[in-house]
Amino acid sequence: MIAPTLLGHIGAVSGANVSVRQFEGLSSGIAIIGGRSYRIGQVGSFVRIPQGYHDLFGVIAEVGASATPETLRDATNRGDRWMTVQLVGESVGVSFERGISQYPAINDEVHLVTDDDLANIYGDEGTGQVVVGRLAGAESIEVRVDLDKLVTRHSAVLGSTGSGKSTTVASLLTSIAGNGVTPPTFPSSRILLLDIHGEYASALRDVATVFRVNPGEGQEPLHIPYWAIGVSELLTFLMGKVDDKAVTSILDRIIADKMNLIETQVFAGVDANALTADSPLPFSLKQLWFDLIDPEIRTYLDDARTNPALVEAGDPALLRANRYQPATSTNSAPYINRQNVLSIKRQLDQMKSRLLDRQFDFMLHPGAWEPALDGQTEADLPELLERWLGSEKPITILDLSGVPSTVLEHLIGGILNIVYEALVWGRDTPEGGRQRPLLVVMEEAHRYLGRDSDSLARDMVQRIVKEGRKFGVGAMIVSQRPSEIDETILSQCGTFVSLRLSNAADRGKVQAALPDSLSGLIDSLPILRTGEAIITGEAALLPIRCRIALPPENRRPSSEDPSVSKAWSNERADSNYARPVAAWRAQNAQFTIEGDDDGTSTG
């Protein structure tokens, strides 16, 4: 008796690809099995190939003339219907494994996979599994991913604008960290989310602590101390281009300032003999500026240059330089200084402008982490890491929407450097990465992880995806333009959550990086529905087409498009463009003018 699930028989085997001649008795595109209807020959659907004590599983990649084996394309039986199936795994009993131990033989039967078969594969509710959604073709079946491999082997969430990336990320993180109401499955989970557009604060407010440049109600101020990030990148940001000789002198002065600090204050683990400019110790930028500007402007009353022509003493705390009598153009007093001059006055003027620019206060004047002129600070790096990684809530959101684009790459690199170095070197402590792993989620990754980028951010993420597995630090890359992301980073991602991708270059990038060679599934990326994804890689038992579980509407990211027709249908209201200009000048979208009656809080 012919089984109702029979689709056809194997006609050719080539590596992971199998050509299947469809059963002639299939007169319809729909099969009724166990009271349920199944579409036959759908690209992306699963098939089962019985092999005695175990079954092979594959995914339909092609259907029709293009699926006909090359050796048969000129044969007389061109009327046969063919499918190309790509093998992905096998099962023994109820245990499923990726990969195959043997190939099928010619004329082996190929069967449709029923909901019961899928339930056996995806029904494992063992430890370390998190629900991400439901099968697109069988929505009664939950889809789970392996949390261990999702984090330690890294992952990428990719999709065009409007495909549902932000909602997918929010859903994934909620599945891991809980919803703030029911007890979480993973109460010690630790997730750091770099939120470039400020989308996630409302969606994850029950399970996340939010740090923001201009904090709103229930949010914390974001402080990123400049002295804890790379000095070379910091000097480039502050001063622009400086010749190598001057840079060396500046670095020597920074080292001297740090040496003076450790003589008066004890920092555990600091070895004076191994101190460098990049050692994460405080130093005062104001004092550095004052010390560097003075030789550039100093004049003397005597030709021996021993008596400075000082008019008024300056104040480094106020960024006010010493004032001297101007030098003459003739060979007479006051004489210009010729000692320790680096010829960097223009660069120092730029540095002063940066230090006075309010939009950089979160980094250059970082609250309790801002050094006094002698380098002393109220708080140190342990307090900073405690705020970022030791919060009672499992997710920490660093909202970078108020960060100027000129410093974004440098800043993200600095954040990752602080976190990664601490967790790697402290890997065997209870706070380290091996004892309590960390997942770093990077939104809009193409903006700072580009192929041509030479930034600290790209270097740090390359380190994380190459080495992080050993130290308990995982990366989740989120992007709408995978073709612009550095190849090394994308190729190290073990799991891909691919939403709708319309751009051919982006699809090609995904296909080249995927651990499973599934061209048929990749070809379906442009026609995925919003919120629908193809999940493939190490965290997924099988490559699957999945409907991501949507959070409630009041728990979704603030990334939805405005309703143009609805907004334009409203009656015109009185305009007051002083409000957007004030918010712009304050670099704070929540800012409002004193006495304004729009209901928002006053900045």
Q: What is each residue range found by the language model?
A:
Residues 198-208, 227-460:
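P-loop NTPase motor domains
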Residues 247-270, 523-554:
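Conserved AAA+ ATPase small/helical "lid" subdomain
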Residues 194, 442, 478-479:
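Hydrophobic residues in beta-strands of the RecA-like P-loop NTPase core, especially within AAA+ ATPase
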Residues 129-214, 487, 535, 565-567, ...:
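Glycine-rich phosphate-binding loop of nucleotide-binding enzymes
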Residues 240, 457, 463-547:
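Conserved ATP-driven motor cores of ASCE-family P-loop NTPases powering translocation/secretion/packaging/pilus
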Residues 303, 310-313, 317-321, 327, ...:
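Conserved P-loop NTPase motor module
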